[in-house]
């Protein structure tokens, strides 16, 4: 196989010469499949060499652990504004050279003038210990009004087969241009933060699950320093302030009848600081293929956002499905004119289809009040290699 034997041995948590444990043997298939390296893992076969000594025979079929994910969206013309395309490219190299190391890159064009990039690396089992470390860099160019850069260092400790905790330290820098500063009141700032989180994952497949639960939550605390421009640092502006950021992701997958599955996802984000009005650069974005279908990418912003994804799926195969969906979103933000909060509903249908080029995805979503031909089309391609 491509995956090195030492990687398999450390993941099954059984050492050579260890006393036989039926409980550990029963966990082998699940542990290896959750890595995402293998297409198939057979049940271990116990054999004896002499007396009470023996071994385990493991048969695995190497999978395609690296992925290319591309999405193309089209926002139709509205009034005097012409329609335009949006796009996303995700490249994930999972199990580099069979070592379990991972490298990923991301690029996204959200609208005419906004794009972001990111790069991440993960080193598993640092120095042979069950300790995974990683780091990342990201940059967002938002509407030509400001640039946001993030650096982070992460540590993950597996506690159980499906449960792990994470810790993170990072730095965020906001660099507005003159338009962002004087028209929108954005300040040049630097934030140092630390976060802790927990993750639980019992899904039977990462790309097309039929059953299981995924849960992740993080709590981040930071110290923000506003640096300028000097004319905007008035007495009403706090030079230094504390920040808190909370995230929650919860997903359920339940089979109902043969090939029919209900998928529910609940997601929430909240940002709190000592500032009366949270700057645009600290707000969360809502809308688009991965949050609220039927609306443009990042169409809404708020210091608090939440969305519910509901899908009724018909399972077509290992990597294929068709579905009906309804997405319900909420966002709120404190503005100079008062508090703004709204609920949004999107609905539609879509499919994921395994082809020779990869997994093709297409969602057609309508926002509440849209006519039948006025929806948003989200097209994507996931290629495993």
Predicted regions and their residues:
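Flexible hinge/switch segments at interdomain interfaces of large molecular machines
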Residues: 1-8, 211
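Amphipathic alpha-helical coiled-coil scaffold segments and their short linker/junction regions
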Residues: 6-11, 22
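C-terminal soluble interaction/assembly domains
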Residues: 14-19, 339-342
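Gram-negative/organellar outer-membrane beta-barrel architecture
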Residues: 18-216, 285-286, 299-302, 359-385
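C-terminal outer-membrane beta-barrel translocator/porin domains of Gram-negative envelope proteins
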Residues: 34, 49, 73-80, 182-328, ...
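A short pocket-lining beta-strand/turn micro-motif at the edge of beta-sheets
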Residues: 306, 318-322, 343-347, 355-360, ...
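Short glycine-rich, acidic/polar surface loops and turns
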Residues: 309-311, 337, 344-352
């Amino acid at each position: 196989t491509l995956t090195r034997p030492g990687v398999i041995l450390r993941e099954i948590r059984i050492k050579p010469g260890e006393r036989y444990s039926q409980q550990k043997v029963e966990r082998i298939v699940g542990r290896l499949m959750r890595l995402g390296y293998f297409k198939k893992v057979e049940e271990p076969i116990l054999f004896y060499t002499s007396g009470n000594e023996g071994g385990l025979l493991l048969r695995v079929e190497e999978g395609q652990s690296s992925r290319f994910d591309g999405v193309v969206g089209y926002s139709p013309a509205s009034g005097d504004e012409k329609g335009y395309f949006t796009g996303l490219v995700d490249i994930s190299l999972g199990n580099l050279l069979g070592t379990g190391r991972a490298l990923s890159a991301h690029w996204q064009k959200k609208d005419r003038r906004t794009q972001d990039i990111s790069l991440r690396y993960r080193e598993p089992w640092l120095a042979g210990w069950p300790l995974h470390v990683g780091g990342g860099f990201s940059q967002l160019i938002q509407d030509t009004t400001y640039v946001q850069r993030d650096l982070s260092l992460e540590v993950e400790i597996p506690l159980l087969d499906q449960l792990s905790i994470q810790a993170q330290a990072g730095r965020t820098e906001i660099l507005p241009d003159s338009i962002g500063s004087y028209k929108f009141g954005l300040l040049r700032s630097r934030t140092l933060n630390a976060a802790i989180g927990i993750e639980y994952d019992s899904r039977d497949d990462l790309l097309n699950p039929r059953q299981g639960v995924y849960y992740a939550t993080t709590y981040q605390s930071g110290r923000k320093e506003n640096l300028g421009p000097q004319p905007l640092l008035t007495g009403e502006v706090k030079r230094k302030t504390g920040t808190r950021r909370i995230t929650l992701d919860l997903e359920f997958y339940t089979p109902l009848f043969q090939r029919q599955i209900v998928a529910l996802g609940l997601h929430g984000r909240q940002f709190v600081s000592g500032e009366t009005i949270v700057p645009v650069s600290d707000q969360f974005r809502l809308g688009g293929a991965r949050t609220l279908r039927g609306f443009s990418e990042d169409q809404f912003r708020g210091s608090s956002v939440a969305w519910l994804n509901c899908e009724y799926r018909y399972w077509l195969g290992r990597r294929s499905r068709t579905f009906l969906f309804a997405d319900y979103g909420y966002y709120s933000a404190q503005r100079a004119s008062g508090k703004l909060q709204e609920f949004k509903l999107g609905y539609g249908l879509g499919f994921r289809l395994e082809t020779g080029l990869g997994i093709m995805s297409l969602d057609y979503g309508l926002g509440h009040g849209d006519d039948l031909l006025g929806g948003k089309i989200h097209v994507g391609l996931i290629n495993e290699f």
